[in-house]
């Protein structure tokens, strides 16, 4: 995770593994000294990853990796934010915001993204993750994009967000924030019905 060899390439595995490992330690480790060491090592690894990312926040692996790279950075930071009762927060950091906004800035329409690296050209954007991340960093661009991803052109309505089942932490986060995005989508549906 970047700690063994200085200057090594870091990729989406760094935040992905760190978010899963830190969650397990916080939930299961009873020895405070061991927990403190795990948190310190994990934060050091994530610091290396965040310093590896360019200032524009782009994921060099392509937009298809956004959920595993920037998305897992969000998960990691939200876990530490919640575990510290808000004392630990990087959500005001510009690079963190730009990493989140990369998903909307790489989108070119009709489900397509600017394709590079080994990423696919079509992307099923995880609207609930984009909403949660955007809400945390205060990005109207991201929350608007999350709602855009819920739009159903055939019906002219906004769908309810989906609770993903393949990532337990994200599923629980979606349940926690679901009322906010659902109310925004319902509000847009009411507005469309009156217009």
Say what each PLM segment does:
Residues 68-195:
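Carbohydrate-active enzyme catalytic cores, enriched for enzymes
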Residues 1-113, 119-120:
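Aromatic-lined, polymer-binding surfaces characteristic
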């Amino acid at each position: 995770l970047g700690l063994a060899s200085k200057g090594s390439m870091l990729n989406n595995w760094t935040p992905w593994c760190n978010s899963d490992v830190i969650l397990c330690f916080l939930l299961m480790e009873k020895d405070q000294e061991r927990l403190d060491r795990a948190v310190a090592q994990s934060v050091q690894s994530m610091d290396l990853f965040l310093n590896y990312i360019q200032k524009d926040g782009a994921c060099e692996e392509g937009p298809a990796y956004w959920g595993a790279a920037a998305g897992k950075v969000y998960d990691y930071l939200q876990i530490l934010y919640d575990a510290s009762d808000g004392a630990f927060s990087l959500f005001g950091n510009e690079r963190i915001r730009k990493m989140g906004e990369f998903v909307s800035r790489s989108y070119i329409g009709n489900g397509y993204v600017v394709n590079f690296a080994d990423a696919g050209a079509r992307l099923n954007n995880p609207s609930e993750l984009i909403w949660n991340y955007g809400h945390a960093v205060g990005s109207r661009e991201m929350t608007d994009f999350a709602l855009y991803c819920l739009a159903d052109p055939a019906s002219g309505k906004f769908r309810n967000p989906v609770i993903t089942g393949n990532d337990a932490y994200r599923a629980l986060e979606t349940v926690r924030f679901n009322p906010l995005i659902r109310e925004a989508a319902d509000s847009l549906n009411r507005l469309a019905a009156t217009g």
